[in-house]
Regions:
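Structural detector for hydrophobic anchor residues on beta-strands
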Residues: 5, 16, 26-28
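Short, charged, surface-exposed hinge/linker loops at domain edges
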Residues: 1-6, 12, 38-61
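A short, exposed loop/beta-hairpin motif centered on an aromatic-Gly-Thr core
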Residues: 24-35
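Hydrophobic alpha-helix-in-membranes signature
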Residues: 21-23, 58
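Short aromatic-glycine-(Arg/Gly/Cys) micro-motifs in beta-strand/loop hairpins
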Residues: 8-21
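Residue-identity detector for glycine
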Residues: 15-18, 30, 55
Length: 61
Protein backbone atom coordinates (compact mmCIF):
# COMPACT_ATOMS: atom_id res chain seq x y z
CA UNK A 1 0.00 0.00 0.00
CA UNK A 2 1.32 3.43 -0.96
CA UNK A 3 1.14 6.07 1.73
CA UNK A 4 1.25 9.80 1.11
CA UNK A 5 2.54 12.34 3.62
CA UNK A 6 2.73 16.13 3.53
CA UNK A 7 6.12 17.65 4.37
CA UNK A 8 6.46 21.14 5.79
CA UNK A 9 9.85 22.81 5.43
CA UNK A 10 11.17 25.69 7.50
CA UNK A 11 14.21 27.79 6.58
CA UNK A 12 16.77 27.93 9.38
CA UNK A 13 20.06 29.81 9.70
CA UNK A 14 21.85 26.47 9.30
CA UNK A 15 19.71 25.18 6.40
CA UNK A 16 16.22 23.62 6.43
CA UNK A 17 14.08 21.63 8.82
CA UNK A 18 11.45 19.23 7.49
CA UNK A 19 8.54 17.68 9.36
CA UNK A 20 5.63 15.50 8.30
CA UNK A 21 2.27 17.16 8.93
CA UNK A 22 0.44 13.86 9.47
CA UNK A 23 3.22 12.34 11.59
CA UNK A 24 4.96 15.21 13.42
CA UNK A 25 7.42 12.88 15.17
CA UNK A 26 9.14 12.43 11.80
CA UNK A 27 11.49 15.39 11.57
CA UNK A 28 14.91 16.07 10.05
CA UNK A 29 17.31 18.82 8.99
CA UNK A 30 19.62 19.41 6.05
CA UNK A 31 21.98 22.06 4.71
CA UNK A 32 19.72 22.62 1.68
CA UNK A 33 16.18 21.64 0.73
CA UNK A 34 17.29 18.60 -1.28
CA UNK A 35 19.36 17.21 1.58
CA UNK A 36 16.53 17.92 4.02
CA UNK A 37 14.04 16.10 1.79
CA UNK A 38 16.36 13.09 1.51
CA UNK A 39 17.00 13.03 5.26
CA UNK A 40 13.25 13.30 5.93
CA UNK A 41 12.61 10.26 3.70
CA UNK A 42 15.28 8.35 5.64
CA UNK A 43 13.71 9.43 8.95
CA UNK A 44 10.31 8.22 7.69
CA UNK A 45 11.75 4.84 6.66
CA UNK A 46 13.36 4.43 10.09
CA UNK A 47 10.18 5.46 11.92
CA UNK A 48 8.08 2.98 9.91
CA UNK A 49 10.57 0.22 10.73
CA UNK A 50 10.54 1.10 14.44
CA UNK A 51 6.72 1.22 14.56
CA UNK A 52 6.43 -2.16 12.81
CA UNK A 53 8.96 -3.76 15.17
CA UNK A 54 6.97 -2.50 18.17
CA UNK A 55 3.58 -3.40 16.70
CA UNK A 56 2.34 0.20 16.59
CA UNK A 57 -0.16 1.45 14.02
CA UNK A 58 1.48 3.54 11.29
CA UNK A 59 -0.31 6.84 10.59
CA UNK A 60 -1.13 7.33 6.91
CA UNK A 61 -3.27 9.35 4.56
Amino acid sequence: MFRSYTARYTKLDSGYMGQLVEWPEVISEGEDIEECRSMLRDALDEMILAYREQGFEIPFV
